[in-house]
Amino acid sequence: MKKHVFFLLLLVFSFSASASAKAPQKAAAETVPADSLRVTIFGDSYSTFYGWLSPATNESWYFPAGHPGHVEGNDVTRVEETWWYQVIQQMGYKLEMNNSYSGSTVGYYGYQNQNYQPRSFNTRVANLGEPDLILSCCITNDSWTGETLGEYKYANWDENDMWYFRPAMARLCAALRLNYPNARVLFILNTDLKPEFCESMRIICKHYGFPLLELHDIDKQVGHPSIAGHRAIAEQVIDYLKK
């Protein structure tokens, strides 16, 4: 049954993708007062914190001090230290939900050749609430797992395409445009990723008319942003949103 639903959704996305790909994004978020603007965080481990994820079954990477899940060597122990919490607080936004999942990929190809479909961004994209703004830092694990780039493909996707980064990323953009036509979407590009993934992301975001914020100078501990790193991400995101 799930497979039939998947293909039905693909048909809908494929039908609308070509017509809407380069259409100007409706910027409803720009007219909503900041104190009532609803933000959804749609990310991977960089955007997690235990107890703040929806669904609650999503895996977290960041935990409070003293929790057995806390990773020694990374100094982030409070949700207030995360980049997304700082953005929401400083901008006066409201958190719609944080649907982030540690280790998640855009495509289905996971670490050690595992099937990451359950945690994939393409699987989770249908459950982002009713946001005015979506902030998504999303391709880090695709770059790290060894996932194949594949070809640029902007319509007529099939399930096999989801195992390749470029078509999977294109389908994600189409799904965001279709499901959240009135939301502003900002993709956030991590540092230290493979150049070919960064360039592919630039090309695909440009095709769909989605802005891409490229981070720089992000301090990391155990491969993840430290307190200083999260602060730097927050500052760069806030600077972009204020433009």
Question: What does each of the following model-derived ranges do?
Answer:
Residues 1-79, 89, 127-132, 181, ...:
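N-terminal secretory targeting modules
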Residues 55-154, 158:
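Conserved SGNH/GDSL esterase-like catalytic core that processes O-acyl groups on lipids
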Residues 43-45, 100, 191:
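A mature extracytoplasmic/lumenal domain signature
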Residues 38, 95, 184:
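Residues at the starts of beta-strands that form the adenosine-phosphate
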Residues 32-33, 115-243:
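Alpha-helical cap/lid subdomain in secreted, periplasmic
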